């Protein structure tokens, strides 16, 4: 697969912590506004610029993208972000509690994405993809990196270990306690070696950022069509990503909450559930293995165990698929979890206490605590050209936006 160093923009050293922000899609409007509060340099003002616009502004309007461009250009004009003197790559380490992961920051080929050398496991939602496409096209900037992974056992592991001995470009701990450390790789011979290493890696997988990667590839096709002298070397043919060895990743569960029992009484619901799976009262709040789900209902925890799963394909045997096919759809009437407003999803970073809180508040009737999907499952499904159910994986920690910017 193809990989390339880039001559991008980045924060000046003492502004990295002020600029770096969470990705656009892990916060709602109110949370985005709160994240940027008291932080005039926050990149949240670029990736979610609607937080600065008048109330009632359509979040997918051109006014939002134009304002994002103004905010981005202001960061550059005021000297808070600077362009590298020469093409480079970076190593990016994140430490959250006892977990550490280090990835390589570079640009990856939109052509590889289109040809499934970069493999996907999720469908995109049209409105969300259009939103990121218009932002990227208006700014001519990759505002946030795509989160990629490759199988273990490549030379990428050695690159990561060798570079971490050098002085860091950035090293700060964010408000949420996650430490971010960045090293720059600018030596031409090292960069050339990395390109050759990736020549021998057959594929990568989108772990997180399907809407970003799809919109970036779409931008590449747009600018190619606009350019009669297109050669393939232009910067728009490449998009910003961070790639991690699979063994370093931490996937947390992506839990479910449903607003009502679809007209069932508690007793009727439990009776139907008992026919769909093995049901036990007083279970642990988090399941201890696959084919198991913990459920919180009316102040009590129950254990659900799915049986008769032999012979199911890689997608149908996922816990999120078993729950959807045997409980959410037939009993609770959740036909399409992508669009049904009766269901919501809670990232595992919030823990089971959040599930109890949501149900106890009566905003939701029932919560389901999942066992995490594995990286091996993700890669097997992508290799088979299949699609995972929505909200199957929650990666943590999240890559920050604003630490690296690729322009084209």
Regions found by a protein language model. Name each.
Residues 1-408:
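Surface-exposed, charge/polar-rich loops and edge strands
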